[in-house]
């Protein structure tokens, strides 16, 4: 029996359509695979770029790390040798003998923290107005001046003398200022009088002091955060010692010893600033 021609034609058309459908399905699958491959490649390329950027940041942080700790150590040691036995130290010690230690400590530290932030800010502004080379030269000269001045004080001072005489002078200043209390009474309505007194006396005593000028000089060519943190830690240690046992400590420490250590440290800063200037 001969097959029906119409049936054969129908079978051929069905087979052809199935083949075309399979081919189109394969092309769409392949296209989607190519698209997915491209997307995956782009994603991996982006991850690679991010990894490179993160790696660069990691290197930068590693480079900043030593500078941060170097500035912290320099400012901390500078404050320790400058403030022990200084006028701000003695003010805190004398006030703590007559007033609650916690209030005196909080008032004095508040003033010193504000002064540290101001000094560090000035140290960062100056290089934007003056070239880094000139600011580094100025810092070198300042360190040298303070170092020689402290060594001169150590040479002229009595080797057996203590800080008692300076404590008496500062106490006379405090007593002479008791009558001028109009401003204190005015601010006393808003702040604790003892806190305000400790803040004002410490702030005025620290303004223009060698530790403030040295902090500004350090901030011009060292890491500002390290300088601020180190100076704040140094002030915290010195002021706490003054409040807790300042009178006893000041009477035991020789002025010559403190001045000698401070002079050597500042001379070391001067040599370091001259031979290892910032890039």
Curated annotation (Swiss-Prot):
GO terms for cellular component: Golgi apparatus; membrane. Residues 1-23 form the signal peptide. Its main location: membrane. GO terms for biological process: calcium ion transmembrane transport; Golgi calcium ion homeostasis; Golgi calcium ion transport; manganese ion transmembrane transport. It is a multi-pass membrane protein. InterPro entries: GDT1-like. This is GDT1-like protein 3. The lineage of its organism: Eukaryota, Viridiplantae, Streptophyta, Embryophyta, Tracheophyta.
């Amino acid at each position: 029996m001969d097959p029906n021609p119409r049936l054969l034609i129908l079978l051929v058309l069905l087979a052809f359509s199935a083949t075309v459908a399979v081919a189109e399905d394969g092309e769409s699958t392949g296209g989607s695979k190519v698209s997915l491959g491209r997307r995956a490649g782009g994603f991996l390329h982006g991850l690679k770029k991010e990894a490179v950027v993160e790696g660069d940041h990691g290197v930068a942080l590693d480079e900043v790390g030593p500078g941060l700790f170097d500035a912290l150590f320099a400012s901390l040691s500078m404050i320790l040798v400058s403030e022990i036995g200084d006028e701000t130290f003695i003010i805190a010690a004398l006030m703590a003998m007559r007033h609650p230690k916690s209030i005196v400590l909080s008032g004095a530290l508040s003033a010193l923290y504000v002064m540290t932030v101001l000094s560090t800010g000035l140290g960062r502004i100056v290089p934007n107005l003056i070239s880094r080379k000139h600011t580094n030269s100025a810092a070198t000269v300042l360190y040298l001046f303070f170092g020689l001045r402290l060594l001169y004080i150590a040479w002229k001072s009595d080797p057996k003398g203590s800080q008692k005489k300076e404590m008496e002078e500062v106490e006379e200043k405090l007593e002479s200022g008791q009558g001028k209390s109009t401003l204190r009474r005015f601010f006393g309505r808003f702040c604790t009088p003892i806190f305000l007194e400790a803040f004002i006396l410490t702030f005025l005593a620290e303004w223009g002091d060698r530790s403030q000028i040295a902090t500004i000089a350090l901030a011009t060519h060292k890491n500002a955060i390290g300088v601020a943190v180190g100076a704040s830690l140094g002030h915290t240690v010195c002021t706490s010692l003054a409040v807790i046992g300042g009178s006893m400590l000041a009477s035991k420490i020789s002025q010559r010893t403190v001045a000698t250590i401070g002079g050597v440290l500042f001379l070391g800063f001067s040599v370091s600033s001259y031979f290892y200037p910032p890039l």
